[in-house]
UniProtKB/Swiss-Prot annotation:
Name of this chain's protein: Glucose dehydrogenase [FAD, quinone]
Alphabetical list of Gene3D superfamilies matching this protein: FAD/NAD(P)-binding domain, Glucose Oxidase, domain 3
Gene name of the record: Gld
Function according to Swiss-Prot or TrEMBL: Essential for cuticular modification during development.
Catalysis performed (reactions): a quinone + D-glucose = D-glucono-1,5-lactone + a quinol
């Protein structure tokens, strides 16, 4: 901490993470973005020097803990917070990154930190049928390397998926994971700020995670809703009874400020002496007895390359995400025996499904123009509106909080949407001068609509490059290798073109950008063959990776964990993140990740004799037993 006192009645820390100027592109942005960051860091609710969990940070861990949680991201922050509610349990949270930077708290900056030092910046192996226009045909996968994980980088959209997603999990041999079983755990975390609008049947107040709409939306957002209505869709809460339609989504934010899992769950736990947090420390291996298969502890490496072993009394929880959870299991000798032998990792337990079943939502960036000058949404006027009132364009994500879900002709039923629409535009993220009306180009303003496949059939895998734990994993996404994914995506493109031709959007002069995609010149523009070519050239992976530590019964050869999230064949090890999803939920995955963590922590508490609450679907965890 620095020696300078702040108006927040406690010491202001040294700046954490990348600066806003650096995330915008460097020197041309230095003056305005640098000044803006100074103003932002003077705001107590943004910098939050008194509320950060820094009192829990440890440079030296203890010798032994009751529970060790690997990964302080979307799920791991929740697990560590919930376990530390039991004062008799000593809990260690291990995070490879540092604390979240202040700039990431601002909703309009949500894309700025992708590609920065708090991003793992993963790339897939060369893809045979997707990302063909990218360098070496590799798809880019941003993943948060920071306390809070990808919940520091994501678009904050709170989408749970469809009822049928979870009913299918249960039907596949995972009792306790049907929709009515998991709804209480969605509600447990939720502090819904719009309860009068969305109702109490599916939502709740009083949880640690604020969920509500941004203070401001551009007028175009409401025009998009009217466009959806013109095509016969209703506007309503897609997290309620009906998951088909349009909405301005609720977000994990309060008063125009992002709430990552770290901010929502760890900062309220900052006074608990039984919670320790190791930052800038990578878990390199889970220590497992080769004969008894009991977990003994965790091996870690700090930012200076020093390694140590930390022992565990009860259990290790792996919450490193759909990329790093299987990676750590493989490094620990848990995985397909033949693949481990190829990289000289000693097999502790042959578990063929580790790293398999990897899948992700996939999209295509459809570009449109509207009759509006291409000026920077960020300027001193919008900055002051945010700094003084937490309102205006910086308090939201432009039109990116609008979304829609619909069923194409390839959907299992009309009530089960297989396509989600995302929107992009009016994002107040970067500016050079701060002047009102600063031109970005001489063109009309661009608007993007992204149709995303919700039920992808294509499957990839995570593997090891070597036995070196600090070498990135091998990621094979296999996007668009199943033809139905391509067909569904093309249906989505044709729908968004229809949407752009509705009366509400025609009033903005919305028109399709007809620039021919390089590599698709041989096809007639707008034909199905053209769009099939285009989606393979300019593939847009979402950041919703899942499935690589699949939950399933022991007779499923590809299952990694059971319905209690215990790793098959290993004692004292569970996985709690989106990697356990048998099939990815139909929508953004942050809300389901938090739900998985809430349910997982409940299962741990129940297994180890802590007082827990009876669960039912009416809400919720209401009686101590």
């Amino acid at each position: 901490m620095s020696a300078s006192a702040s108006a927040c009645d406690c010491l202001v820390g040294v700046p954490t993470g990348p600066t806003l100027a650096s995330t915008c592109g460097g020197s041309a942005f230095m003056l305005f973005m640098g000044l803006l960051e100074v103003f932002i860091r003077s705001q107590c609710d943004l910098e939050d020097p008194c509320g950060r969990a820094s009192s829990r940070f440890r440079s030296e861990p203890d010798y032994e803990y009751d529970f060790i949680v690997i990964g302080g991201g979307s799920a791991g922050s929740v697990v560590a917070s919930r376990l530390s509610e039991v004062p008799q349990w000593k809990v260690l949270l291990i995070e490879a990154g540092g604390d979240e930077p202040v700039g990431a708290q601002i909703p309009s900056m949500f894309l700025n930190f992708i590609g920065s030092d708090i991003d793992y910046r993963y790339n897939t192996e060369p893809e045979p049928m997707a990302c063909l226009s990218s360098m070496e045909q590799r798809c880019y996968w941003p993943r948060g390397k920071v306390l809070g994980g990808t919940s520091v980088l994501n678009g904050m959209m709170y989408v749970r998926g469809n009822r049928e997603d979870y009913d299918d999990w249960a039907a596949d041999g995972n009792p306790g994971w049907a929709y009515n079983d998991v709804l209480p755990f969605f509600k447990k975390s939720e502090d819904n700020l719009d309860l009068d609008e969305v109702g109490t049947e599916y939502h709740a107040k009083g949880g640690l995670l604020p969920v509500g709409k941004f203070p401001y939306n551009p007028p175009l957002s409401y025009a998009i809703l009217k466009a959806g209505e013109e095509l016969g869709f209703s506007v309503h809460d897609l997290n309620g009874q009906n998951s088909t339609g349009f909405m301005i989504a609720q977000m994990t934010a309060r008063n125009g400020i992002r709430y990552s899992s770290a901010r929502a769950f760890l900062r309220p736990a900052r006074m608990r002496n039984n919670l320790h947090i190791l930052l800038n420390t990578t878990a390199t291996k889970i220590l497992i007895h080769p004969h008894t298969k009991n977990v003994l502890g965790v091996e870690v490496s700090d930012q200076f390359g020093s390694t140590r072993k930390i022992l565990v009394k009860k259990e290790v929880v792996l919450s490193a995400g759909a990329v790093n959870s299987p990676h750590i299991l493989l490094l620990s000798g848990v995985g397909p025996k033949d693949e481990l032998q190829q990289v000289n990792v000693r097999t502790v337990h042959n578990l063929p499904g580790v790293g398999k079943n990897l899948h992700n939502h996939v999209t295509y960036f459809t570009n449109f123009f509207i009759d509006d000058a291409d000026t920077a949404p960020l300027n001193w006027a919008t900055a002051m509106e945010y700094l003084l009132f937490r309102d205006g364009l910086m308090s939201g994500t432009g039109i990116s909080d609008v979304t829609a879900k619909l069923a194409t002709r390839y959907a299992d039923s009309p009530e089960r949407p297989d396509l989600q629409l995302y929107f992009g535009g009016y994002l107040a993220s970067c500016a050079r001068t701060g002047q009102v009306g600063e031109l970005l180009s001489n063109n009309s303003r661009s608007i993007q609509i992204f149709p995303a496949v919700l039920n992808p059939r294509s499957r990839g895998f995570i593997g090891l490059r070597s036995a070196d734990p600090l070498e990135p994993p091998r990621i094979v996404a296999n996007y668009l290798t199943h033809e139905q994914d391509v067909k569904t995506l093309v249906e989505g493109i044709k729908f968004v073109i229809r949407l752009s031709q509705t009366t509400p959007l025609k009033q903005y002069g919305m028109r399709l950008d007809k620039t021919v995609v390089k590599g698709c010149e041989a096809h007639a523009f707008g034909s199905d063959a053209y769009w099939e070519c285009a989606v393979r050239q300019n593939t847009g992976p979402e950041n919703h990776q899942a499935g690589s530590c699949k939950m399933g019964p022991s007779h499923d050869p590809m299952a990694v964990v059971n319905h209690e999230l215990r790793v098959h064949g290993i004692r004292g090890l569970r996985v709690m993140d989106t990697s356990i999803m048998p099939k990815v939920s139909s929508g953004n995955t942050h809300a389901p990740a938090v739900m998985i963590a809430e349910k997982g922590a409940y299962l741990l508490k129940r297994a180890w004799g802590a007082k827990v609450u009876r669960v039912d679907a009416t809400w919720t965890l209401h009686r101590v037993i």
